[in-house]
UniProtKB/Swiss-Prot annotation:
This is Dihydroorotate dehydrogenase B (NAD(+)), catalytic subunit. The active site is at residue 139. It is found in: Cytoplasm. Belongs to the dihydroorotate dehydrogenase family. Type 1 subfamily. SUPFAM superfamilies: FMN-linked oxidoreductases. It is an enzyme of class 1 (oxidoreductase). It catalyses: (S)-dihydroorotate + NAD(+) = orotate + NADH + H(+). Its cofactor is FMN. InterPro entries: Aldolase_TIM (IPR013785), DHO_dehydrogenase (IPR050074), DHOD_1B (IPR033888), Dihydroorotate_DH_1 (IPR024920), Dihydroorotate_DH_1_2 (IPR012135), Dihydroorotate_DH_cat (IPR005720), Dihydroorotate_DH_CS (IPR001295), Dihydroorotate_DH_I (IPR049622). Pathway: Pyrimidine metabolism; UMP biosynthesis via de novo pathway; orotate from (S)-dihydroorotate (NAD(+) route): step 1/1. GO terms for molecular function: dihydroorotate dehydrogenase (NAD+) activity. It holds the Pfam family DHO_dh. HAMAP family: DHO_dh_type1 (MF_00224).
Length: 314
């Protein structure tokens, strides 16, 4: 291991992802504490996240689905929020606040119904100078948006290319697991010019009240997140790491440093945390410290030494 100058502390976790400097490989996932600039800054400063992603913002104000829109299960959460948002003009001030006050990169999550709508939203948020954009082509419970686009490789490529044409910052594409072959969608994003893919969004799910017979969610069905989806996410990351040349950011069921290391060994360049933030905002620092201790104990000089390690175990 290379020796450092006296007084300088080795950083096991700091690295660059799609040109963005992260203090650690943990990122706040879209949709959790990303509604205001203040909450994004809190996650970055108090929580210790390496980067933060906003809630998904669209071309027009949207109220979302009726309540109940989120329920807790034994194995995670089931939600059908329906992409509620104030529109990009209504969110611009919050994004500007986050950019001015966050000590970590701020990524704007956006959605639309067509490639031109995605481009419109991206252009509309550019004055706030987000560090990157994350394209939500994977929400499973918003008709005409999200997975309705993300299950079509041609549309994914077109949406990605449309946004790349109007921005000069990295573009990440968040993928849905609710397809026959996620690598096909990942390849489409890469062909469109994506700088990274994010895998995965929630898995289609449903819960029914057996006393009444009614579906529990106001939208009847929704998306499952939390611990139950981690094996699905790990497999998707593993497959995408093999199929793509661009980085894969893992998300789905990460609630400990062990989960994060597993995702990284599958091929994730970084991990996003969503559902687990409801338990404690400081989980990002906890995961970062746990990964660093693991790297030291195992004798790895930095996190890149374990990225995709599972692929070498043949």
């Amino acid at each position: 291991m290379q020796k450092l100058p006296a007084g300088r502390k080795r950083s096991y976790l700091m690295y660059t992802l799609t040109g963005l400097k992260l203090k650690n490989p943990t990122i706040l996932a879209a949709g959790v504490l990303g509604t205001t600039g203040a909450s994004l800054c809190r996650v970055a400063r108090e929580g210790g996240a390496g980067a933060v992603v906003t809630k998904s913002i669209g071309p027009a104000p949207k109220t979302g689905h009726p309540n109940p829109s989120m329920i807790e299960l034994d194995c995670g959460f089931l939600n059908a929020m329906g992409l509620p948002n104030p529109s990009y003009p209504g969110f611009l001030q919050e994004l500007e606040f986050a950019k001015e006050n966050s000590d970590a990169p701020v990524i704007a999550s956006i959605f639309g119904g067509t490639p031109s709508e995605f481009a419109e939203v991206a252009e509309g948020l550019l004055p706030a100078k987000p560090d990157a954009f994350e394209l939500n082509v994977s929400c499973p419970h918003a008709e005409g948006y999200g997975a309705a686009i993300g299950s079509n490789p041609c549309l994914v490529e077109a949406v990605t290319a449309a946004v790349k044409d109007v921005v000069n910052v990295p573009v990440w594409v968040k993928l849905t697991p609710n397809v026959a072959d996620i690598t096909c969608i990942g390849n489409a994003a890469e062909s469109g010019g994506a700088d990274a893919v994010v895998a995965i969004n929630t898995v289609k799910g449903m819960a029914i009240d057996i006393e009444s017979g009614y579906p529990v969610l106001g939208n009847r069905s929704g998306g499952l997140s939390g611990k139950a989806v981690k094996p699905v996410a790990v497999k998707c990351v593993y497959d995408l790491f093999t199929a793509l040349e661009i980085p894969v950011i893992g998300v789905g069921g990460v609630s400990s440093w062990e989960d994060a290391v597993e995702m990284i060994m599958a091929g994730a360049a970084a991990v996003q945390v969503g559902s687990a933030v409801y338990d404690r905002v400081g989980i990002f620092s906890e995961i970062g410290k746990g990964i660093e201790a693991f790297l030291k104990r195992k004798g790895y000089s930095d996190i890149k030494k374990i990225t995709g390690l599972a692929h070498e175990m043949v």
